Amino acid sequence: MSKTYHFIGIKGSGMSALALMLHQMGHKVQGSDVEKYYFTQRGLEQAGITILPFDEKNLDGDMEIIAGNAFRPDNNVEIAYADQNGISYKRYHEFLGSFMRDFVSMGVAGAHGKTSTTGMLSHVLSHITDTSFLIGDGTGRGSANAKYFVFESDEYERHFMPYHPEYSIITNIDFDHPDYFTSLEDVFNAFNDYAKQITKGLFVYGEDAELRKITSDAPIYYYGFEAEGNDFVASDLLRSITGSTFTVHFRGQNLGQFHIPTFGRHNIMNATAVIGLLYTAGFDLNLVREHLKTFAGVKRRFTEKIVNDTVIIDDFAHHPTEIIATLDAARQKYPSKEIVAVFQPHTFTRTIALLDDFAHALNQADAVYLAQIYGSAREVDHGDVKVEDLANKINKKHQVITVENVSPLLDHDNAVYVFMGAGDIQTYEYSFERLLSNLTSNVQ
């Protein structure tokens, strides 16, 4: 008899992916969340998964309850009711740690790029063999017959500590989440603790100084662009408007040429990590090569649309390193167009900690438009930073805009608009799309 799972906070990206995966494995799944629309709920609704408002009546002692990490007794009625009545529940990462023991598990960790890399690994492996996976863009796939399980491994609040995968990629280490981590050293220590839990193979970006200090009982394989000191090396790069082609060598042995239809140097590294892991795990590289060619990307990572001949890119980038990577990808695909960045800072703590870095990253665009800072539910705005503080540090043409008036964005010809952020930047994007549609309607 299949279990019934109830998710408290089912619209969260990891939670929705897990709900979809369990649903596809034949379990009954339901969940609760706020009424505000979030991009993950489309997949849940298409699967026929019930989404309820938060209410203590949703809970049944016979259910297995999985709670989002942000919810506590003081901010959620279901958690409060469960605590008061002795109803047990597991946090997302606690459940995942026990769930993965039944599979050959492959994790993807890192400050940046883990969702794209998890998506790439999941795409390739699931086309080769039966695979279940969880991606941080809200995508999940479950199979009752799967031997392999691919998942995204999140460092925030050390949520990845219950995980003991056979294989893992770590894309990079960078200072982020300043509301939790106190320093780069603190971030490193978290990743190093995680690395010690890998059992068969750890694949790390060899040109990251912090990752060079990582220790693990599992064999460590370094990947990168530089031949010296790396095990898996990407070379002979050909970057074009159709994607990237490159050759991979393993300790001097030519593994052949590969092509990915995605953009930016960071995606070449993501692919090299995937190639290295699957080669080491014994998979046929001809199959890996074949399925890399069809990887189209993940949700909210360089997602493109064209509205009345205007190219709009939506990306989750909310850290300076991610912004630079996204703008690099835009320039690769659209070398003759003006690159216009529309960015919403995410959390006051991150904006304060990385203000100069944000300015440097955004200056890689040709023009910059800023939305008001999106505060996290975990923090209070003490007025220590405003978006104008960031605007004052940007050298390129720049302006602060509101969601009610995005018309300043029209002041560009032959431009690509790159909307970036982890808050509600999509509301600005949709406002701009409506404006473009109305202009066309008026002309017609």
Swiss-Prot record:
It is an enzyme of class 6 (ligase). It holds the Pfam family Mur_ligase_C. One of its GO terms (cellular component) is cytoplasm. Phosphorylated by StkP in vitro. Dephosphorylated by PhpP in vitro. ATP binds at G110, A111, H112, G113, K114, T115, S116. Belongs to the MurCDEF family. This is UDP-N-acetylmuramate--L-alanine ligase. It comes from Streptococcus pneumoniae serotype 4 (strain ATCC BAA-334 / TIGR4). The lineage of its organism: Bacteria, Bacillati, Bacillota, Bacilli, Lactobacillales.
